[in-house]
């Protein structure tokens, strides 16, 4: 994925599509997987919360 694909312009402002890594800081994005967010540089991982269906 290229850096330009991680941003979009909305109402004349630059908006990030992905989150930055809290360990590495600005400029290092977290990759979005089906069940987690992962940093490719330091290995930081955040798991997504699973919504349980009411029965």
Curated annotation (Swiss-Prot):
Keywords: Metal-binding, Ribonucleoprotein, Ribosomal protein, Zinc, Zinc-finger
InterPro entries found in the cross-reference section: Ribosomal_eS31, Ribosomal_eS31_arc, Ribosomal_zn-bd
GO CC term (a single one): ribonucleoprotein complex
Binding site for Zn(2+): 21, 24, 39, 42
GO terms (BP aspect): translation
Top-level lineage group: Archaea
Keyword Ribosomal protein: yes
SMART domains given in the database record: Ribosomal_S27
GO MF terms, alphabetically ordered: structural constituent of ribosome; zinc ion binding
UniProt cofactor note: Binds 1 zinc ion per subunit.
Signal sequence, renumbered to the chain: none
Classification via SUPFAM superfamilies: Zn-binding ribosomal proteins
Zn-finger segments (C4-type): 21-42
KW Ribosomal protein (keyword) present: yes
Family: Belongs to the eukaryotic ribosomal protein eS31 family.
HAMAP family on file: Ribosomal_eS31 (MF_00777)
Protein name per Swiss-Prot or TrEMBL: Small ribosomal subunit protein eS31
Native source organism of the sequence: Thermoplasma volcanium (strain ATCC 51530 / DSM 4299 / JCM 9571 / NBRC 15438 / GSS1)
């Amino acid at each position: 994925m290229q850096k330009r694909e991680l941003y979009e312009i909305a109402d004349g402002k630059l908006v990030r599509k992905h989150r930055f890594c809290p360990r590495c800081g600005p400029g290092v994005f977290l990759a979005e997987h089906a069940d987690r967010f992962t940093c490719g540089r330091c290995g930081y991982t955040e798991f997504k919360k699973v919504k349980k269906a009411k029965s």
